[in-house]
Amino acid sequence: MKLDVPSDLGMVGDAVELVASHLPPGTLSPRRISFNLRTALAEALGNAIRYGNGEDPERVVQVRVELGRDFVRIHVMDDGLGFDTGRLPDPTHPDNLEREYGRGLFVIRHLVDDVAFNEKGNGICLTLRAG
């Protein structure tokens, strides 16, 4: 499945539901779909729209879904310049606990089984395994 999502934060929910509704039964448990997948994908899309594409309506976020026998892999790529994930501040550090932002990737990493980034830093790959 491939999907181009307009850079409009109002479209995130519809895009997440479209992806979740197209997963074959039994690919992931209902709980993993209803919470882990939906939450992680919504966060990744929101970051791509807000930070990658700067909410520019002329840009889109590309979503590609790969289905395996026991996994779902979701690629999310924006049109932005990318960023170095190693330079993100640790959201659990005492100096960062009261920040209003900066927890998105931390949350994603705890919801999915594997997270990978493309070399440019404008694409994220989320892998959820059955079980």
Tell what function each PLM region has.
Residues E43, N47:
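Conserved polar catalytic motif of the HATPase_c/GHKL fold
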Residues M1-R31:
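Helix-loop-beta hinge of the Bergerat
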Residues M1-K2, I49-G131:
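Conserved beta-strand-loop-beta-strand hairpin that lines the nucleotide-binding pocket
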Residues A20-A42, L97-R99:
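Conserved short strand/loop->alpha-helix "switch" segment adjacent to the catalytic nucleotide/phosphoryl-transfer site
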